[in-house]
Swiss-Prot record:
Keywords: Cytoplasm, Endonuclease, Hydrolase, Manganese, Metal-binding, Nuclease. CDD domains: RNase_HII_bacteria_HII_like (cd07182). SUPFAM superfamilies: Ribonuclease H-like (SSF53098). Endonuclease that specifically degrades the RNA of RNA-DNA hybrids. The gene is rnhB. The lineage of its organism: Bacteria, Bacillati, Bacillota, Clostridia, Eubacteriales. GO terms for cellular component: cytoplasm; ribonuclease H2 complex. It is an enzyme of class 3 (hydrolase). This is Ribonuclease HII.
Length: 272
């Protein structure tokens, strides 16, 4: 990019708007090229052609959005460090408490909060992210996390022991499955009962805590992929889209065909 900027600085007038526009479209504004993007944006903004100048404004806007995102995510990492001098802080979250079918899944994640130059951008409450972004982030989180673990209870366990017990149980099992023992566990929503370790709960933790947000994303992707596989076996329930929740299509299929082996019978009393 340095050579491109140098050439543009000397010969920008020889670049047509289309060429400049195509170059800007191909640019990936990221943490490694912020200085170069700013230099290019300033250069384009100074061009007398309004359409070229507008491309500079667009680049500048993209750069500012990246900087804001960095600050947002850094604050999530700072939040995890705000509880005290803990070396390893784990976040734990669940997905699948409310569906009529499928498991409840929990994930626990420990991040490297000591290196703020390598934070994972765009992490958030998994429900606020697109499916594509969740899938992408899930792989990045698994690669960059110091440790992560996933636990689940299936529909039979939920019917036998209750959703409250299973929710707490998968929290514990996910934390116990980490290959690094956490000094502190941050749990989304409420404290973990009968947990043998330091634990603090965070209301709406998946929007405040970096490690809880990462756990939310991993758990969501893992469970969604399970439900996509069940969709192949039971296509009439539309599990690929509703992932087990009680949509009209799902409820209509239940009334017409009846439940499957993955349905939570204790959740269907008011439906069947």
């Amino acid at each position: 990019m340095d050579n491109l900027i140098k050439d543009m600085r000397e010969n920008l007038n020889s670049y047509s708007f289309k060429v400049v526009s195509d170059l800007v479209k191909e640019l990936d504004v990221n943490r490694d090229n912020k200085a170069q993007i700013k230099e290019l944006a300033d250069l384009l903004k100074e061009d007398k052609r309004k359409n070229v100048s507008s491309l500079g404004n667009r680049l500048e806007k993209n750069l500012n959005n990246l900087i804001k995102e960095e600050e947002r995510v850094k604050n999530m990492y700072f939040f995890d460090k705000s509880f005290g001098d803990y070396k390893y802080v784990a976040g734990v979250d669940e997905v699948g408490r409310g569906p009529l079918a499928g498991p409840i899944v929990s994930a626990a994640v420990i991040l490297d909060s000591s290196n703020l130059d390598d934070i994972i951008l765009y992490i958030n409450d998994s429900k606020k992210l697109s499916e594509h972004k969740r899938e992408e982030l899930s792989e990045i989180i698994k690669e960059k996390a110091l440790s992560y673990s996933i636990s689940m209870c299936d529909s039979k366990e939920i019917d036998e022991k209750g959703i409250g017990y299973c929710n707490n149980h998968v929290f514990i099992k996910a934390c116990e499955g980490l290959n690094i023992k956490p000094d502190l566990v941050l749990s989304d929503g409420y404290l973990i009962k009968n947990f043998n370790g330091e634990n603090k709960h965070v209301i709406k933790g998946d929007t405040k805590s970096a490690c809880i947000a990462c756990a939310s994303i991993i758990a969501k992707v893992y469970r969604d992929n399970i439900m996509k596989e069940y969709h192949k076996k039971y296509p009439q329930y539309d599990f690929e889209k509703n992932v087990g929740y009680g949509t009209k299509t799902h409820v209509d299929a239940l009334k017409e065909v009846g439940p499957t082996e993955i349905h939570r019978m204790s959740f269907l009393k008011n439906i069947l």
